[in-house]
Amino acid sequence: MDVNASKVDPKLLELLVCPLTKGRLSYDPEANELVSEKARLAYPIRDGVPIMLISEARKIEE
């Protein structure tokens, strides 16, 4: 996969919120995930598409 293809459009990032908390998300380029610090969840991005399902999110351990 092209490295640039996995980047998240900043405008999309402004629109997306955590489905659990409705809070802001940040992009983690190393893991290619959208992270909700408040919910302690990381949502995967697959083939350039954010998967915004709580059931698909990875729990962030401390």
Curated annotation (Swiss-Prot):
- GO CC term, one of those recorded: cytosol
One Pfam annotation reads Trm112p
- SUPFAM superfamilies hit by this protein: Trm112p-like (SSF158997)
The protein's superkingdom reads: Bacteria
Q: Where is the signal peptide?
A: none
Q: Which family does it belong to?
A: Belongs to the UPF0434 family.
Please report the name of this protein according to its UniProt entry: UPF0434 protein Smed_3047
- Lineage of source species: Bacteria, Pseudomonadati, Pseudomonadota, Alphaproteobacteria, Hyphomicrobiales
